[in-house]
């Protein structure tokens, strides 16, 4: 039989079968888990997903093993490209606790772009200071690219170290605050 997805309903064992072209899962990635589909040594983000949903899905981008927060998992390659391509200028917002006291100097340096080592320079980024103490500051960092360990390398470039890092959003997609670490929807 030929099914018209617009008009026909298909049931199996008295349950309605819905056509889904792509699957999208929002994961609150915990620390200690790697952003990969397979790993021989560490638990992966796909290990957190029920096996019924795992076929063909992959994480959109990567979060370091010690970073937590928003990770989109999908089988939609076009969407992944739209979110990750530096040419698309999609904002990625992170909350960070960093060593040292941040001020106007760091804001200006982030705005200019930073030499992050290995002959690479970050694009302009936004730095918003939430709390600044002598020992530690809390900041929001907005970047439009995703170079390897980029936020950590940017912090190092201004003489600081990341103590805690969490991705809050990618473009208009924001981490659901109701999701506990390791949960997805």
How would you name each of these model-derived features?
Residues 1-185:
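Basic, flexible Lys/Arg- and Gly-enriched helix-loop patches that mediate nucleic-acid binding at interfaces
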